[in-house]
């Protein structure tokens, strides 16, 4: 299954979750898109619940199915902690996500574009791989030639708050993942146990 590239507002309404983080998609129409949307919230089976939760998390981070499943497999190899939480931490450590958490982009999709276009440095070296895994303490910054890119400056100005597990210098446009996040600091609306149950049959 390829990465979804259609309108985020439509997918947000289908999943019942704001993919942009603004909540605007659900403010006026908090039901699935389509002619019968307002009356189409039918009760889901156990599998349906697992699938819906998996899709919410996958679309939130903007990953293709193969990438998403591979991260689950990688999480199974971590000996400490629960599989679900370890999986969530691996998602958070992706470079595109850290760029988003720092406020250098307004959405993860935009953050991925900034990384792909070579605007982002890790410890002073350009990294254009969105899935690059960031370690605590590594410095994420904007390339000097990109420091006046309007979209980046607008994102920084629009960011009202940042998670406690990152630090950021708005003047220098650089920051870092200071530590790994705690479970209650990331995606409280997601039940990762359902996601793990969905993949248990495949692992």
Curated annotation (Swiss-Prot):
User: CDD domains per the record?
Assistant: S4
Pfam families of this UniProt entry? Ribosomal_S4 (PF00163), S4 (PF01479)
Q: Name one GO cellular component term.
A: small ribosomal subunit
Q: Which InterPro entries match?
A: Ribosomal_uS4 (IPR022801), Ribosomal_uS4_bac-type (IPR005709), Ribosomal_uS4_CS (IPR018079), Ribosomal_uS4_N (IPR001912), S4_RNA-bd (IPR002942), S4_RNA-bd_sf (IPR036986)
Query: What keyword terms does UniProt attach to this protein?
Result: Ribonucleoprotein, Ribosomal protein, RNA-binding, rRNA-binding
How does this polypeptide assemble, per the annotation?
Answer: Part of the 30S ribosomal subunit. Contacts protein S5. The interaction surface between S4 and S5 is involved in control of translational fidelity.
Note the HAMAP family from the entry: Ribosomal_uS4_B
Q: What is this protein called?
A: Small ribosomal subunit protein uS4
Please give the organism: Streptococcus pyogenes serotype M49 (strain NZ131)
